[in-house]
């Protein structure tokens, strides 16, 4: 696996590098789920700044757990209680934290390109924990690992990404990563929520959910940002749910057993029904991987931090 200095996105990342991260994740997953987990403190003494300008539950806590499992300490950052409220720029915030001798940055920011920007002004490793509508690479890695763990490979599996693709950083990173690893990707959404360049992405396009589900081996359901219903993208949340909500009734029509993923948080009974979201065992036409994704998120972030801080000279 080629040496990584930063992880700002999956666009342009080689299949070899992706495979290396997924292989390393597999090792950490085995340790993480062992009856008595015991981790090597390979990052002992390292300090990781979690710089989150947006709210987060799964991503922030899993990065914190990943760091602690490897022996590193974390510094929490909240924009609302920092000098950002006094007008301090992102650049100055990062430079000041670097001057405190932190060893790496995990950044979540509402502006697309922010992670790439700070990777150019610091010598420390930068991990993108979500930047605007651009990318969310560790979420895509955990989605890909979840799929690979179930199917044994990513090559030739068909993944339908359903929902608000236009505004989704999760969708973008998954498209880049899955296609690189040889998977087939389908996008299913109202035309108002598809990116204008969708036809150039090398994906299949669907506006009919039944057709997409009949094509797919797995469904990655995206969180619908509720403001889209008032922003002119959708007639109403109810109409969206009728046409694009993942329910047992709709799955039964496809007569296929699908793996169901969702990055969270869930809008229950809008993009996905309670029964589909919570079903982890048969009978039924689907298996929910939502909590498995959360577990895998810790292992993926351990692999990323280990690669950037311990394995890179």
From Swiss-Prot:
SUPFAM superfamilies assigned: Aspartate/ornithine carbamoyltransferase (SSF53671)
InterPro entries named in the record: Asp/Orn_carbamoyltranf_P-bd, Asp/Orn_carbamoylTrfase, Asp/Orn_carbamoylTrfase_sf, Asp_carbamoyltransf, Asp_carbamoyltransf_Asp/Orn-bd
E.C. number: 2.1.3.2
CC terms in the record's Gene Ontology section: cytosol
Pfam families tied to this protein: OTCace, OTCace_N
Reaction(s) the record says it catalyses: carbamoyl phosphate + L-aspartate = N-carbamoyl-L-aspartate + phosphate + H(+)
Gene3D superfamilies recorded: Aspartate/ornithine carbamoyltransferase
Record NCBIfam families: asp_carb_tr, PRK00856.1
Family note: Belongs to the aspartate/ornithine carbamoyltransferase superfamily. ATCase family.
Function: Catalyzes the condensation of carbamoyl phosphate and aspartate to form carbamoyl aspartate and inorganic phosphate, the committed step in the de novo pyrimidine nucleotide biosynthesis pathway.
Protein name per the record: Aspartate carbamoyltransferase catalytic subunit
Species for this entry: Chlorobium luteolum (strain DSM 273 / BCRC 81028 / 2530)
């Amino acid at each position: 696996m080629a040496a990584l200095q930063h992880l700002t996105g999956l666009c342009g990342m080689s299949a070899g590098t992706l495979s290396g991260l997924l292989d390393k994740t597999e090792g950490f997953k085995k340790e993480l789920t062992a009856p008595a987990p015991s981790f090597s403190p390979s990052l002992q003494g390292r300090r990781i700044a979690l710089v989150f300008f947006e709210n987060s539950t799964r991503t922030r806590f899993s990065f914190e757990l990943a760091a602690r499992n490897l022996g590193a300490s974390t510094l929490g950052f909240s924009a609302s209680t920092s000098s950002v409220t006094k007008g301090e720029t992102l650049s100055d915030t990062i430079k000041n934290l670097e001057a405190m001798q932190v060893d790496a940055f995990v950044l979540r920011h509402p502006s697309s390109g922010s992670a790439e920007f700070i990777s150019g002004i610091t010598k420390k490793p930068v991990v993108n924990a979500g930047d605007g509508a651009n990318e969310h690479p560790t979420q895509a890695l955990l989605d890909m690992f979840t799929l690979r763990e179930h199917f044994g490979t990513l090559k030739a599996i068909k993944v339908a990404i359903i929902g608000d693709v236009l505004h989704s950083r999760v969708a973008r990173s998954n498209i880049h990563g899955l296609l690189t690893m040889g998977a087939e990707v389908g996008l299913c959404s109202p035309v108002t929520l598809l990116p204008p360049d969708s036809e150039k992405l090398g994906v299949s396009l669907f506006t009919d959910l039944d057709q997409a589900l009949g094509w797919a081996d797995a469904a990655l359901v995206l969180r619908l940002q509720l403001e889209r219903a008032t922003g002119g993208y959708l007639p109403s949340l109810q109409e969206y749910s009728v046409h694009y909500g993942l329910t047992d009734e709709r799955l039964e029509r496809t007569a296929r057993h699908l793996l169901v993923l969702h990055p969270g948080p869930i809008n229950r009974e809008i993009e996905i029904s309670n029964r589909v979201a919570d079903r982890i065992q048969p009978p039924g036409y689907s298996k929910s991987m939502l909590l498995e994704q959360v577990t895998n998120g810790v292992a993926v972030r351990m692999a990323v931090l280990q690669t950037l801080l311990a394995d890179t000279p």
